């Protein structure tokens, strides 16, 4: 199991500063080592916390042309729909950085508009396998699952991550790379998501949480409570939890220091 680090910040601004530095440092590392940097985004508040990457020194120093962008989960809708994680990321981040359009891998727009969750999941898995064959995505040494360089994740108050929800069968999927959901307890009901083995094969996983509403689930997940999807999070190299004081308020004393 990869080491788990916990970093608690006094303000969201301080967290955004450190998240930008962490991401930029890994970008530099992987661009030098591999010539590409594979990044997996999530929805929710995560995109808003990437704003420091849009400023100096990062906007001009990051090798954006070597980034390849994927999603840990997506709502089954058209790209321009208000529920779309792609739209959220594009409007708030991707439209402001020079990542080549051909390096951005969103859900199939037509299948999203049709609401075909099962086929959309199959197509996205096919896309990932194509990128593995093109040596853009590596595969994990023992399992053959895709291995992304960095995943930027968030967690819901119920402890869900991606579109893996407590009590859902999808959390136990061990073969598929991407699976579909048609009964999400959080609207919209139709989604696709990377499976837990794929999420846990990433080299680096960041979990960013800023809300007192999530404090109980943060404490439970960091205690590796297995009925919470976020409690099963690991990685190949390391997992880092970026938390504000409210989200960390239920952690045992001494588990982490405030930065």
Swiss-Prot record:
GO aspect biological process, one term: pentose-phosphate shunt
Keyword annotations from UniProtKB, A to Z: Cytoplasm, Hydrolase
Annotated Gene Ontology cellular component terms: cytosol; plant-type vacuole
Top EC class for this record: hydrolase
Disulfide bonding pattern of the chain: none
GO MF annotation terms: 6-phosphogluconolactonase activity
Pathway named in the protein's UniProt entry: Carbohydrate degradation; pentose phosphate pathway; D-ribulose 5-phosphate from D-glucose 6-phosphate (oxidative stage): step 2/3
EC number(s) per entry: 3.1.1.31
Subcellular localization, as worded in the UniProt entry: Cytoplasm, Cytosol
Recorded catalytic activity of this chain's protein: 6-phospho-D-glucono-1,5-lactone + H2O = 6-phospho-D-gluconate + H(+)
Phenotype caused by lack of the gene: No visible phenotype under normal growth conditions.
Main location: cytoplasm
PANTHER family cross-referenced by the UniProt entry: 6-PHOSPHOGLUCONOLACTONASE (PTHR11054), 6-PHOSPHOGLUCONOLACTONASE 2-RELATED (PTHR11054:SF14)
Matching NCBIfam families: pgl
Main function: Catalyzes the hydrolysis of 6-phosphogluconolactone to 6-phosphogluconate.
Name by which UniProt lists this protein: Probable 6-phosphogluconolactonase 2
Organism: Arabidopsis thaliana
């Amino acid at each position: 199991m990869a080491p788990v680090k916990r970093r608690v910040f006094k303000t969201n601004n301080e967290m955004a500063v450190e998240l930008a530095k962490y991401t930029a440092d890994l970008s530099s590392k992987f661009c030098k080592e591999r010539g590409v940097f594979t990044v997996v985004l999530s929805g929710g508040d995560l995109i808003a916390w990437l704003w420091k990457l849009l400023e100096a020194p990062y906007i001009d120093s990051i090798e954006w042309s070597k980034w390849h962008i994927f999603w840990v989960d997506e709502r089954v809708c058209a790209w321009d729909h208000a529920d779309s994680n792609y739209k959220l990321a594009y409007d708030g981040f991707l439209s402001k950085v020079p990542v080549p359009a051909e390096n951005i891998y969103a859900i199939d727009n037509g299948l999203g508009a049709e609401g075909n969750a099962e086929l959309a999941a199959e197509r996205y898995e096919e896309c990932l396998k194509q990128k593995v064959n093109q040596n853009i995505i590596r595969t994990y040494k023992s399992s053959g699952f895709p291995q992304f360089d960095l995943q930027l994740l968030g967690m819901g108050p119920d402890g869900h991550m991606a579109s893996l929800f407590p009590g859902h069968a999808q959390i136990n999927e061990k073969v598929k790379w991407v699976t579909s959901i048609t009964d999400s307890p959080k609207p919209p009901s139709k989604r696709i998501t990377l499976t837990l083995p794929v999420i846990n094969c990433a080299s680096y996983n960041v979990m960013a949480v800023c809300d007192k509403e999530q404090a109980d689930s943060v404490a439970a997940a960091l205690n590796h409570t297995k009925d919470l999807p976020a409690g099963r999070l690991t990685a190949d190299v390391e997992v880092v939890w970026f938390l504000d004081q409210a989200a960390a308020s239920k952690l045992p004393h001494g588990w982490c220091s405030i930065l």
